[in-house]
Amino acid sequence: MFKKTFLALLLSIGFGSNNFKYSYTVITTNEEINIDGNLDELVWKTGTPISNFSQKDPQPGEPARQKTEVRVAIDNEYIYVGAYLFDNSPDSIAKQILRKDGWGYSDWFAIGLDSYYDKRTCFGFHVSPSGSMRDMLHYNDTDTDDSWDAIWESKSVINNDGWSTEMKIPLSQLRYNPSEEEQRWGLNFYRRTARYGEESFWAPIFMESKGFVSQFGILKGIILPKQNRRIEVLPYISSTD
């Protein structure tokens, strides 16, 4: 009985500790980033990338089968994401071309941003190897609104050892509290490898926990004195090289 109680206590502590253990400091940049999926800008060689994803399915808690490296940068108008999704069998990458907000049989990479840092609300941005895009709003920690649409850019490239992607997300598409002082946002990354039926996250999502956004890690180093409300109008184009 004591053993079971002690184990339950350890697990409950673990479920609430992601936002302390998993943290990343955003890269502040003035570099012009060309969204072509190639990760050849200097910013994508800065600092240590996020890695070490853990499976949610099919083997919860086990390391993801394929390596992922991610960096996040920011300027006065945009959040940028550069990710390399290694794959030792690139010919097996699932890359079905889909309409915007489609799902289908495809590999995926996503970022989740809790820009209010309320541990209940998250803006999600997904991209596939074919360049297909999805966006959604998570609210009440676990609920999802797939009808939410943002204006943002991405491009993916399939290489001989995996695929890479770049995202450019206008700050005007997010909701946050402007401040002259450094603020923190909730952060997580997701990868789906379709042929394995595998879903993995940077900050682990424990099935035993009732929450989703509340299990995110932390994005640090953000200073945004004012909220950008510039209107963005961009066409949706699904493409890959």
PLM features per residue range, with description:
Residues 4-13:
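Sec-dependent N-terminal signal peptides
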Residues 16-241:
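Structural preference for beta-rich elements and adjacent junctions enriched in aromatics
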